[in-house]
């Protein structure tokens, strides 16, 4: 009789990256963003493989302390036991040195925190050690494609890091004079896009609705009239945004909070967003073969402007499984629960092949 085969041992390898972050006192906004960045595969690898060490820029304001503490924290999140939780207190010390607005234990806005953090990390691993003087030469005589390339080159002569490689795209702004028809264009780098949420009387609001509202042609009239450089006068104009260069990582900010001076309020509209195959070609400023994105992380805000709580839903770059990160508590979740009316920041990764310049 043939010998019985020994059962194949189940893999004992633990999927790492499922470690929680302790709440130091209203620091859930920080924990949510840190977990989203920890699951950004290329940024994670940059920290885990110590690639950042060769890029550290000692000319930076913080002398590389912020990047070093961030990398240390990412390494802890990926080497600790899934049942453990890590204290981000050393990291918090450095981020509040870099951005004093985060001193103390008040609740903060996660999108603002992300902006400050990425800016700080970028500065400390900027490959440009000595920035050239800003070039004031006008590029208005050039065709748009060439103008955008030149503007991007000028940007990279001053800002060039592994962080900006991942997160920075280029936005095109077109201003058309209704008197003479002249169209002026500007090309600006962006780290994220803040999307208005449309008010609908019926039917669900989708992420594409938000993007279409963001890129919709706006009329600038009355006090908003700009000066047309051809008419040499303030004229009624139309303004439109489009995406010139798609970033590797696209962060979409759903504008849930009003900026009213007297009393802030929050929109709890459910926005339906795709988990994969978000095709953004219709928002490209030039013909584009590929601009398809897949979701891998969401920063959520529950509650009101007066009292709320941040969590993160992240898809592991190793197992492709979704987990909920609620400060020190990490639990598996179904992908069908990722969409909710608490979604605030959406992290998408560009699927290959890339259409970037």
Swiss-Prot record:
Catalytic activity reported: Thiol-dependent hydrolysis of ester, thioester, amide, peptide and isopeptide bonds formed by the C-terminal Gly of ubiquitin (a 76-residue protein attached to proteins as an intracellular targeting signal)
Keyword field contains Ligase: no
Positions contributing to Zn(2+) binding: 177, 180, 228, 231
Sequence ranges assigned to domain USP in this UniProt record: 19-351
Keyword vocabulary terms for this entry: Biological rhythms, Cytoplasm, Hydrolase, Metal-binding, Protease, Thiol protease, Ubl conjugation pathway, Zinc
Enzyme Commission code: 3.4.19.12
UniProt entry tagged with the keyword Nucleotide-binding: no
This protein's GO CC annotations: cytoplasm; perinuclear region of cytoplasm
Compartments reported by the entry: Cytoplasm; Cytoplasm, Perinuclear region
Protein name: Ubiquitin carboxyl-terminal hydrolase 2
Gene: USP2
């Amino acid at each position: 009789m043939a010998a019985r085969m020994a059962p194949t041992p189940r893999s004992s390898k633990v999927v790492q990256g499922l470690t929680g972050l302790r709440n130091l006192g209203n620091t859930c906004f920080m924990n949510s963003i840190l977990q989203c960045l920890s699951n950004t595969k290329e940024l994670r690898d940059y920290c885990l493989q110590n690639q950042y060490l060769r890029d550290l820029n000692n000319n930076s304001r913080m002398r590389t302390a912020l990047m070093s503490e961030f990398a240390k924290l990412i390494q802890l999140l990926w080497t600790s036991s899934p049942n453990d939780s890590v204290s981000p207190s050393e990291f918090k010390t450095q981020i509040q040195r870099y951005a004093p607005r985060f001193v103390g234990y008040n609740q903060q806005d996660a999108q603002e925190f992300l902006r400050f953090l990425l800016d700080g990390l970028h500065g400390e691993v900027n490959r440009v050690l000595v920035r050239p003087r800003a070039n004031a030469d006008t590029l208005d005589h050039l065709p748009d494609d060439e103008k955008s390339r030149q503007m991007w080159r000028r940007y990279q002569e001053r800002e060039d890091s592994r962080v900006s490689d991942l997160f920075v795209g280029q936005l095109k702004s077109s201003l058309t004079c209704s008197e003479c028809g002249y169209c002026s264009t500007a090309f600006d780098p962006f780290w994220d896009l803040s999307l208005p949420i449309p008010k609908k009387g019926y039917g669900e609001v989708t992420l594409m609705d938000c993007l279409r509202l963001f890129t919709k042609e706006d009329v600038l009239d009355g006090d908003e009239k700009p000066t047309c450089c051809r008419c040499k006068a303030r004229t009624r104009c139309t303004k439109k945004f489009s995406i010139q260069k798609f970033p590797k990582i696209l962060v979409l900010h759903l504008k849930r909070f009003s900026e009213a001076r007297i009393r802030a309020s929050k929109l709890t509209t459910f926005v339906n967003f795709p988990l994969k195959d978000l095709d953004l070609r219709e928002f490209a400023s030039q013909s584009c073969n590929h601009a398809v994105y897949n979701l891998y992380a969401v920063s959520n805000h529950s509650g009101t402007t007066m009292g709320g709580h941040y969590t993160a839903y992240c898809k592991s770059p190793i197992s492709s499984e979704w987990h909920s990160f609620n400060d020190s508590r990490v639990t598996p979740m179904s992908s069908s629960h990722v969409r909710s009316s608490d979604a605030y920041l959406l992290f998408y990764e560009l699927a290959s092949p890339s259409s970037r310049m």
